[in-house]
Amino acid sequence: MRSPVYRGAWAIAVCAIAAIMGAGSPASAQNPSYPQNPSYPQGAPPQDKKDKGAQPSDAERQAATKVTSAADFNAALQAAGEFVKKHPKSSLRPEVTRHLVAKAALNQDTAQQITMLESALGVMKDPPDAEIINPSILDAYLKAQKFDDAFRVSTAILEKNPNDLVTLTLMAIVGIDQARAQNAKFVPQSLQWAPKAIELIETDKRPPHLDDSQWAEYKTKLLAQLYQALGVYAMMTGDFATARTKLDKSASINQYDPITYVYLAGVVQEEYAKLAQQVKSMLPGKTQDETLKKALEKMDQMIDLYARAIGLADGNPQYQKVRDELAGDLKSYYSYRHGNSVEGLQQLIDKYKKPQQ
């Protein structure tokens, strides 16, 4: 059985995905992130919630105003330190903490932002303060690719709130992205958090802070990414049956992600390779013919999946290298199955292009 050169399921997937990870930024950059912290008007005192205990005194308000009116983060941090020293139980404390986070967010330098937020944690030391600061510092750690710190903070967040869907989803995907980049340190957490996130989404446990459009994204794009991540890890461990199940599920939820089809093609290619090897070891006859037929059916599936991935990637610069990587393989397989001709190949690709909206 002379057929196109077999490159291996994981090799195919890795080469294609490397094309979109080549810039060095984590794949999590496209994944869920925490809502931006609110900013407060300069000099405006934070407003306490009426159901959060005693009304603040004038002294508390004045101390809080020193934080909000501070010229820069360092001045605000110093004022916040004075505030918590004098009024540690104030109902304004959460809003003072949020203001520090908002001040830090104004700095566009991620390294400086991390330093600021870590300093804020050093001053605002109560557990409720950390609950306010941690989401922002987690986001900053991820931007800086400080993954050890990011998973440390994530663990703290989830110990306090095990059903924090944003953290579960984000970090499950990031952990498997890291495994794909040869850093398997965070796989145990990811394999624990991804199923939990899937369960929360599929049972419609919508977090109150997500609006309708955000929740719709979780139920489609992000749910699909979670299944895709689990499928990727199954491929990495050689469990191609599980990988196929997870990736098929991902594709059924979001049919427009070309990367899912790249991975599925890798799984099918592994199935094809096994059948092709069996054909080579068989004597001519009915059994060999039947096995050959099955192998060619797998090749046809690969052709379809490659065409789908290339079609869906059309027009998106992010996926140009993916298209280039797959195009040669697709042409080779297609021409093998069509008498050394590529007639009709472009029409097949065009069929799978994403409809214009």
Where are these regions (language model features)?
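Short coil/linker segments at helix-helix boundaries
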Residues: 74, 111, 132, 173-221, ...
